[in-house]
Structure formats: C-alpha cells, structure tokens
A protein has these predicted regions:
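Acidic, Ser/Thr- and Pro/Gly-rich low-complexity regulatory segments
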Residues: 1-160
Length: 160
C-alpha cells in the first residue's frame, strides 16, 4: 500500500482509522443505551459523558447520543450548567450551533439560569479557558476572538 511511502499521510490515515473506530464504539454504546431509563443512564455515566463531550467540542458524540436518547440534551451538572452552557463557556461553536438550531430549544436554552444566576450572556462574557485562548498568538487576536464570540449573543438578548 502506498500509504507507507508518503510522509504525513500515514499519520492522517491512522487518525482517520482511529476516528472511524471511535465512531463505531459510540454507535455500539448508543444501541446499548437506547432503552435505558434515567437511573441506568446515570449508572452508565451517560450524563457525565455528554457534559465532557460538550466541554471538548465532540459534536458527533452529542448528535448520536441525543438521537437515541433526546433527554440527554437537557442534562445539567451540579452548577446547573448544561451542554449549551458548557459549549458557550468553552467556546465550542459546532455544539452551540447544533443545539441552537434544534426546533424548540432556542427559548429554553437562552432563558436558562445556572446556580450562580448566570444566563447565557454572562457565560459568553466570561474569559475562555486558557486552552482555547492559547490557540491564537498575541493578546490582540485573543481579544478579537473573544469579542467576536460575545457579539454572537447580542442579537439573542431579547430571548432572555
């Protein structure tokens, strides 16, 4: 196979295989939990997995899990922050867009208040995690990205 002869291609091919295998495991897990009740989902750590996927921006995970168990979309942590809140806090644009485009979710997610009385505007105004800020060199570019992120929420303020 010519994959071994081209530098860099082997690494990409390996990553693609790993992604395909992870997706297959996810689909198997989804088939397994499709009939689970709330306590079984808790025991299977499905709630924690959803929140972690939101924090890390793994939109495929959120899509597949909510396809088999739509109630997982509304899971919250001890601070009453759900998937949407973590997507905002961690600047996970794909997850934000996925949830925001879902029918009937716009009013629910925009009006949600966490345990600290923060709504989505407050969360958007908080500083991004350092791992996200470090993706952009220089304070000016970091500030520009933070401002762009916050401006997304200005038109949505009337929902709050």
């Amino acid at each position: 196979m010519c994959v071994n002869f081209v530098p860099g291609i082997k690494k990409i091919y390996s990553q693609k295989q790993t992604h395909a295998q992870a997706l297959e495991i996810l689909l198997c897990f989804c088939r397994k939990i499709s009939g689970f009740d709330e306590s079984q989902l808790q025991k299977a750590s499905a709630y924690e997995a959803m929140l972690e996927a939101a924090k890390h921006g793994i939109v495929e995970f959120i899509i597949e899990m909510t396809r088999v168990c739509p109630d997982l979309l509304w899971v919250v942590d001890e601070d009453l922050r759900g998937i949407f809140s973590h997507a905002i806090l961690c600047r996970r644009e794909k997850i934000f867009n996925y949830i925001f485009q879902l029918k009937g979710s716009r009013q629910l997610v925009t009006s949600h208040i966490d345990a600290f009385d923060n709504n989505m505007l407050h969360l958007a105004g908080m500083l991004a995690p350092s791992s996200e800020l470090d993706l952009r060199p220089g304070a000016a570019l970091q500030m520009q990205r933070e401002l762009q992120w916050f401006k997304v929420f200005i038109p949505l303020a009337h929902f709050i």
